[in-house]
Amino acid sequence: MGKTPVEAKKILHDRPHVDCPIKDLISRIGDKWSMMVLMALDNAADNVMRFSELMRAINGISQRMLATTLRYLERDGIITRRVYPEVPPRVEYTLTKRGQDLLVPVKNLVGWISNEWPEIEKSRDAYDRQSDSKSN
C-alpha cells in the first residue's frame, strides 16, 4: 500500500535534499524522453519493442538519447532489455512490473494534463498579459 499524505510529508521533511530518492526518481522518470519511452512501450503489442521501433515511435529523439534513456530506465528496473543471440543481433525492451505500476500515476497525470491544458493555457495568457501591462 502507498504512503499516507502524513507519511509522505514526513519522508520529504526528514530526508536531506541531496539524498532524496523522490527528487532523484522524479528527475529521471519525469524527463521528456522517459515518459515517451514508457508510453510507447505501453502502446506496443505485449509492451515489447525493438530499438528501431522505439526510434520510429518517438518523434524527435536521437539514437544517443534513446540509448541513454533506455539504459537509465533499465538501471532503475522500469524496463528490461533482452538480447537474442542472432545475426544481426535482436534486442527487445519491455516494461517490468515496476514499469507497469509506474504507468498508473503517469496515465493519471497525462489525463489530468489533457483535461486541464485549456485552462492552463488561459492562465498563462492572463498572467503574460498582466506581466506585459506592468512592464509598460
Question: Can you say where each PLM-predicted feature lies in the sequence?
Answer:
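Amphipathic alpha-helical dimerization/coiled-coil segments
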Residues: 2-7, 19, 103-136
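Short, Lys/Arg-enriched N-terminal segment that forms or immediately precedes the first helix
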Residues: 5-26
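Short, hydrophobic secondary-structure boundary micro-motifs
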Residues: 37, 50, 82, 120-122
